[in-house]
């Protein structure tokens, strides 16, 4: 499934004293199976952009083409597009409303006019994907769960729609480290096992470096950087100029290099740093 964004522009409160251009002539192509991280300072246009991809917002100019269908046209059935493109908002647990977890997850599939058998199959699959045991949790109230578990239920409700593209807006916001790691692990598995296209909005450069295959940097409504994590995080000066940064481990490794250690400064994850440091220690041990 391909997504093409052509000359996309969106203006809030147009023709008023409070007019603000949130998206400014953005051009992108998202290919099937990519894991894209969308980063940028608050107000850079990230959330506005993803709401256009899902069809929740209409642009003032430009086009969004999903599988050769221009979704900005009035005659397009957006319900069909949203079957393909799922969106998980920030703090999605606040949108839970049913009396049981099973009913909450079933809400989306029921609106697809599926058979009861297919709905039950999707509920079980979605709960399994997010790490919730079906028999244990199906009849529980979602409001009895921890914050991390509520987040999983909310994500399962979108996953049960079986979208080809899953967009997540800060899915780990407000979670403790354990809950955060579990959610990210489940998102990684979705991408790996089902070849699902993932668009992840995140403020964590560490998570982005570890998970994404491509990084888009937004600033004042424009996409100013677009590339693999190694390419984007090498642009430290550009990132810092727009209020962002490279992963902390990158600064650490560059500092060690400045102090005379013979190491690569192009390190962006803890795992990469571990391998690089072990290589140095092993070389020193061999030379002793």
UniProtKB/Swiss-Prot annotation:
Pfam families: ABC_tran
Class of enzymatic activity (EC top level): translocase
Chief localization: membrane
Molecular function terms, GO-annotated: ATP binding; ATP hydrolysis activity; ATPase-coupled transmembrane transporter activity
Residue runs in coiled coils: none
Leader sequence residues: none
Full protein name: Energy-coupling factor transporter ATP-binding protein EcfA2
Lineage: Bacteria, Bacillati, Bacillota, Clostridia, Eubacteriales
